């Protein structure tokens, strides 16, 4: 197989894999990750003032 045929084969594969498609399963995964991130952020928001207060008491 020469370089041109190999290049065209790889280019076609890339175009097929990166083409526009419906989100489907990736959208569900993204939503779950987003929810987990929000929960971590909210927990950190609540815990950081407590931790900062504990450090201030230890000085």
UniProtKB/Swiss-Prot annotation:
Propeptide position ranges: 58-59
Family matches, as InterPro entries: Cecropin, Cecropin_insect
Induction of expression: Up-regulated following bacterial infection. Expressed in adults within 6 hours after induction and accumulates over 7-10 days.
Superkingdom of the organism of origin: Eukaryota
Expression by tissue: Hemolymph (at protein level).
Any one GO CC term of the record: extracellular space
Location, primary (coarse class): secreted
Keyword list, A-Z: Antibiotic, Antimicrobial, Fungicide, Immunity, Innate immunity, Secreted, Signal
Keyword Secreted annotated: yes
Annotated S-S bridges: none
Range of residues in the leader sequence: 1-23
Compartment(s): Secreted
Claim: Secreted is one of the keywords in the record: yes
GO biological process, one term: defense response to Gram-positive bacterium
Family affiliation: Belongs to the cecropin family.
Function: Antimicrobial peptide. Antibacterial activity against Gram-negative bacteria E.coli D22 and D31, E.carotovora, K.pneumoniae, P.aeruginosa, S.typhimurium, E.cloacae B12 and X.campestris and Gram-positive bacteria A.viridans, M.luteus, B.megaterium and S.pyogenes. Possesses antifungal activity against F.oxysporum, F.culmorum and N.crassa, C.albicans, C.neoformans and S.cerevisiae. No activity against Gram-negative S.marcescens Db11, Gram-positive B.cereus, B.subtilis, B.thuringiensis, S.aureus and L.monocytogenes, the fungi A.fumigatus and B.bassiana and C.glabrata.
This protein's name: Cecropin-A
Organism: Aedes aegypti
Organismal lineage: Eukaryota, Metazoa, Ecdysozoa, Arthropoda, Hexapoda
Gene responsible for this protein: CECA
């Amino acid at each position: 197989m020469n370089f041109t045929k190999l290049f065209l084969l790889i280019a076609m594969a890339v175009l097929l894999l990166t083409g526009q498609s419906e989100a489907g399963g990736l959208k569900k995964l993204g939503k779950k990750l987003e929810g987990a991130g929000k929960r971590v952020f909210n927990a950190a928001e609540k815990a950081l003032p407590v931790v900062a207060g504990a450090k201030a008491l230890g000085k």
